[in-house]
Amino acid sequence: MSNNESYEILKFGLEHFDKEGKNNNHNNNNNNNNNNNTFNIFETHIESLRNESKMLSELLKKNLQSELLNLPNSIRKMSMEEFLQHCLDIDAINVTSVPTLINNKDNNSETEQQQQQQQNGNNGLSLTELLFSPEKSVNEIDNSNSNTSIDSESMNNIKQKVIDILNSPQLILKKKGFNSNNNL
């Protein structure tokens, strides 16, 4: 199930919920005896929507994890930094004019690398470790050192960037080369 399909399912559910709420609200104005029933209907419906969204979220995560397993082992074991650098290198090969970030890389490589490591506490983790690691709860984030931990939102942003990169046309075109050469 793709992200778009999941989004459409959730959107449909919320629209249905909204329509049902308007209908029930109109009926309640005519008959106050149904207040408790309406509240229970809403509560039940909200709970079912929560369960459905949780299930879809887990399904999407499992699909992403299974797609990750289909990648060559050499890519899965790369750290996030290595993977992003590798993608930049592929872009540099495919683009006639090299971006300034790559042109200036030798001049500022130490400073940029230190800044990246400070911003990204999980740089040493492989893509597999990042995507298969459980997300931290709010309590775990509050109790951990803010300099070394990464919050759930940042982890989700990283995961989304990985998904976007994995779906990039450059990587898809080069995938056969990765599998046959295994030179990363």
UniProtKB/Swiss-Prot annotation:
It comes from the Eukaryota. Pfam families: Nbl1_Borealin_N. InterPro entries: Borealin_N. This is Putative uncharacterized protein DDB_G0285671. It comes from Dictyostelium discoideum.
